[in-house]
Curated annotation (Swiss-Prot):
GO terms for cellular component: cytoplasm; plasma membrane. Domain I is involved in oligomerization and binding regulators, domain II is flexibile and of varying length in different bacteria, domain III forms the AAA+ region, while domain IV binds dsDNA. This is Chromosomal replication initiator protein DnaA. Plays an essential role in the initiation and regulation of chromosomal replication. ATP-DnaA binds to the origin of replication (oriC) to initiate formation of the DNA replication initiation complex once per cell cycle. Binds the DnaA box (a 9 base pair repeat at the origin) and separates the double-stranded (ds)DNA. Forms a right-handed helical filament on oriC DNA; dsDNA binds to the exterior of the filament while single-stranded (ss)DNA is stabiized in the filament's interior. GO terms for biological process: DNA replication initiation; regulation of DNA replication. The gene is dnaA. SMART domains: AAA, Bac_DnaA_C. InterPro entries: AAA+_ATPase, Chromosome_initiator_DnaA, Chromosome_initiator_DnaA-like, Chromosome_initiator_DnaA_CS, DnaA_C, DnaA_dom, DnaA_N_dom, DnaA_N_sf. ATP binds at residues 159, 161-163. One of its GO terms (molecular function) is lipid binding. Belongs to the DnaA family. Residues 87-106 are annotated as: Disordered. Residues 1-94 are annotated as: Domain I, interacts with DnaA modulators. Oligomerizes as a right-handed, spiral filament on DNA at oriC.
Length: 451
């Protein structure tokens, strides 16, 4: 039996969930709102232009095909627009601040937000690795409580900017509504507050406080793992805030479904809104971050030196800033100019560690394990797609993550010519723009190699 219009979109989602990765599904398709008010047309509302463009480019044809097949209507048209579905879903909460019951609507005292005023959108350096996260964070700050992005779940490795964005969202909300009750808290501090409340017999006050918030920002939610009592209480707080349209923003070092010993009901709720990854910054972004930080600290950092540091240190923003602070302090103490030679000497231990962590051999091993092939296959001559593509990817990663020259990389891949390596790098760069699955593989491998 063909689904009626009210259930067609849900049927589409169920089918599409089996066709694309869970990360892509949660990021791009799940937040869309479907409207059937126009005959023979499904209008999908995206929360911002960035999501609309991505859906148009990567998923619209697939969406249209599935919708036509499920509806039995070959003339059905699927469109994507930026905005909110005209008629709100009855089951969904309204946007902040139209919330609270009569008792909660009483005037609330101002609370301490624990936000860092230095972490704002204006000084967050944007690049390809964090572009989507930056866009959705801004959207949440502008329209807190919007159902399509509530909760907002940001995940990625240590030192990539999750906490900065978390504070930027909170500061953005407060800049638009100074009376908003916004709280930033680390997961460990939440647990400690709860322990204290139980000890002091003040759980009622604890619950009342958290349920009075307009926006709750919890950092490093993965620390709730194994803490059954904490998870139980947070479950009820989450439900109360979500059901009344208050904004929830969470960060973690991993995708919610990958957090072990966290209740399934919490994992499910964390995926109700928008889940977005922050990847390790690419070279251009690393250089931009260094130059921005140097400008903020009034440090003269020549661009070629920033480029040198960015090439050598590839892990995260925190390491880049630490390196800059060390270079600046040593230069000031010694009265020396900041040159490439000076940086090489000052950071020699950090650079040696980085070179030791990421080698061509290590990349080959990780890529081989990822694609379930042998390292010898990567060094061989097989032109089979199942071997050639991972080989090209491993070459491109070697160029990106190590300081080896093209001839040196080629030598490690069975004495391949440097032009073969160059072709592989260009091919992978091209395919990353065209095939989202390859871009996801690239990001997963970068993340693994950057640990």
């Amino acid at each position: 039996m063909k689904p009626d219009l009210s259930s067609l979109w849900q049927e589409c989602l169920l089918q599409l969930q089996d066709q694309i990765s869970l990360t892509d599904f949660s990021t791009w398709l799940r937040p869309l709102q479907a409207d059937f008010s126009v005959q023979n047309t499904i209008v999908l509302y995206a929360s911002n232009v960035f999501i609309k463009q991505k859906v148009d480019e990567s998923y619209l044809a697939q969406l249209t095909k599935v919708a036509q097949e499920l509806s039995g209507n070959a003339e059905l048209v699927v469109q994507v627009k930026v905005g909110v579905k005209p008629e709100p879903k009855p089951a969904q909460p309204s946007a902040l601040p139209t919330h609270h019951n009569k008792e909660e609507n009483k005037p609330q005292t101002v609370i301490r937000s624990y936000l860092n005023p230095k972490h704002v959108f204006e000084n967050f350096v944007e690049g390809k690795s964090n572009q989507l996260a930056r866009a959705v964070a801004q959207k949440v700050a502008d329209n807190p409580g919007e159902p399509s992005s509530n909760p907002l779940f940001l995940y990625g490795g240590t030192g990539l900017g999750k906490t900065h964005l978390l504070h930027a969202i909170g500061n953005g909300i407060l800049s638009r509504n100074t009376n908003a009750r916004v709280l930033y808290i680390h997961a460990n501090n939440f647990m400690q507050q709860m322990v204290n409340a139980v000890r002091d017999n003040k759980m009622d006050e604890f619950k009342k406080f958290y349920r009075s918030l307009d926006a709750l920002l919890v950092d490093d939610i993965q620390f709730f793992a194994e803490k059954e009592k904490t998870q139980e209480e947070f479950f009820h707080i989450f439900n109360n805030l979500f059901d009344t349209g208050r904004q929830i923003i969470l960060t973690s070092d991993r995708y919610p479904k990958e957090i072990e010993k966290l209740e399934e009901r919490l994992k499910s709720r964390f995926g109700w809104g928008l889940t977005t990854a922050i990847e390790p910054p690419e070279l251009e972004t690393r250089v931009a971050i260094l130059l921005k930080k140097a400008e903020e600290k009034n440090i003269y950092l020549p661009e070629e030196v920033a480029f040198f540091i960015g090439q050598k240190l590839r892990t995260n923003v925190r390491d880049l800033e630490g390196a800059l602070n060390r270079v600046s302090a040593n230069a000031e103490f010694m009265g020396a100019a900041i040159t490439i030679d000076f940086v090489r000497e000052t950071l020699k231990d950090m650079l040696a560690l980085q070179d030791k962590l990421v080698t061509v051999e290590n990349i080959q091993k990780v890529v081989a394990e990822y694609y379930r092939i042998k390292v010898s296959d990567l060094k061989g001559k097989s032109r089979s797609r199942s071997i050639a593509r991972p080989r090209q990817l491993a070459m491109a990663l070697s160029k990106e993550l190590t300081n080896r020259s093209l001839p040196e990389i080629g030598k490690n891949f069975g004495d391949k010519d440097h032009t073969t390596v160059l072709h592989a790098c260009r091919k992978i760069a091209e395919l990353r723009e065209q095939e989202h699955s390859l871009e996801e593989d690239w990001s997963n491998l970068i993340r693994t190699l950057s640990v």
